[in-house]
Amino acid sequence: MKKKFPAISLSIACVAFLLLLVAVFGKDRMSPDMFKSMFAGFFAEKLTTEQLKEDYVYAIEDEGSKKIKILIAPGHNESSPGAAFLNLREVDMTSELGEEIFGLFKNDDHYEAVLLRGKNGDHPDFTEYFNRERENIARVRDRKRAQMKNYISDGLIRKEEPIPHVTVPEETSLRLYGINMWADEIGASIVLNLHFNDYPRKRINLPGEYSGFSIYIPYDEYGNARVSEAIAEKVLSRLLKYYFVSTYPKEGIGIIPDWELISLGANDTLKAASLLIEYGYIYEPQFKYSQTRKVLMRDMALKTYLGVQDFFGGTSTALSDTAILPYLWDEDISQGDEGKVSVLALQAALASAGFYPPLGKTRDDCPLTGVFKECTRSALASFQENV
């Protein structure tokens, strides 16, 4: 019974503090953000949606104000290359996608974009920081882990069963905690972690059972949870225009709170808003061909950028909502074609017009692939019948 007393005392203290705020400020003078933050989680809210949006406004109105610093973190590196399928490697795909996303934010005056890992390896400033602070990173990680175990055993934090993840090696763990600490060190407000999913199977040279994208966010007890969720909702909405959420049942809600993923700030180790986006399963057909994959990467990057912009309310009407269209068809296409950008553009155009996927099919049945099979034939026939 004694282990429950701290939690009860904490709850009484929170209620008393809330009543004091209402008494001092009056309910009408308190913003919704102030009320919500009282119940945001066990850990103090480190960055609110209101604060982040105010920073964006200042970045627009005052040239001397700091820009929104956003860290683009392509998942994995050569020492830990991540998922693989046939000739595809996750480390290469996230690097390509990272370059696309980085370019969009870099060209927007409201942001200061930082790319953690590019074609030539890690950002030199991160490499210097990691080598210099290596021992301190390990100490902070171990201390935070121990604190979390104590909070859980004392009943102060509710622990939910997590989605199974691959256990990372010691060196990878240290690197990921180091990225979190460096993100806070450089004053990043948003961290976008880029990944491609995989699912265990006996025949690794064949596609797996599941497909679709998912967005992981910090567990709701963490101090960066609420602002991360607000951004994730906007990115999800953008991606849903052409893509579909994961068919893996535990990812089917699209946005999944997770308390174990280090990149999101496991053990409350990150101040910045953080999203870990699995843009699809590496064995999905749309990633097979380099030409169509490159266009899809640009489109996914654009939708990610626009989603973040939607959060701030700053989306430009001059920007198209897709990198696939408009497209000039200058070649014949026919059923059986594979890996053609012209087919991908046709699928996207049919999707925009409401004909793809065809009636009776889902986006899981008929993803945008650049492959002309029955899905495309049926959708095109339906379009021709209705125009």
Question: Could you tell me what each predicted segment is?
Answer:
Residues 1-386:
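Catalytic-site microenvironment of enzymes
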